[in-house]
């Protein structure tokens, strides 16, 4: 968290008013009690509160993680998606309040945002294994479903997908953003 390159990236994010959230570690995925310490470390580097999160590997245990996120002051989580299938894990394209399984009551503070699409879901042989044209068609179809539902389009594109070794994912991302900006 203290490298010069990361500091430059954080400065760039700040200059463009990007919101930075906590990427809950694999370790905290096994031990939710680690979430507050990870959040505090990120806040110390940023010098500002962190209220958003997503779990590594989309790994989320209920209700332990939900309770830990709430206790840590996280208000918005973006983990609700499947790695092996694009679409709406929550059955909706709209953000929803977390429901506590034990009490069946709505969380007063934690909102779950459906993850619409993760790039490796499209391309990886162990998941959907789509070619570029099929991946673009699916991404645009999902974006259209989100638009019709007045939902929230959440895309997860890993930084490694912007490298020359990522197959079609870098160009897909650029094309998808351009088409979405044009109203596709």
Regions found by a protein language model. Give the residues of each.
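Metal-dependent polysaccharide deacetylase catalytic core of the NodB/CE4 family, i.e.
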Residues: 1-60, 64, 159
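Alpha-helical structural signal in soluble globular domains
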Residues: 12, 16, 41-45, 68-74, ...
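C-terminal domain-boundary segment and adjacent tail
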Residues: 13-15, 136-184
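Short acidic (Asp/Glu) and glycine-rich catalytic loops that position anionic groups and cofactors
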Residues: 18-20, 118-123, 156
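Short loop/turn segments at strand-loop or loop-helix junctions that form parts
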Residues: 25, 113-118, 157-160
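Histidine/acidic-residue-rich catalytic or RNA/ligand-binding cores of hydrolases
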Residues: 31-37, 62-68, 88-93, 165-174
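Active-site-adjacent pocket scaffolds in enzyme catalytic domains
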Residues: 43-146
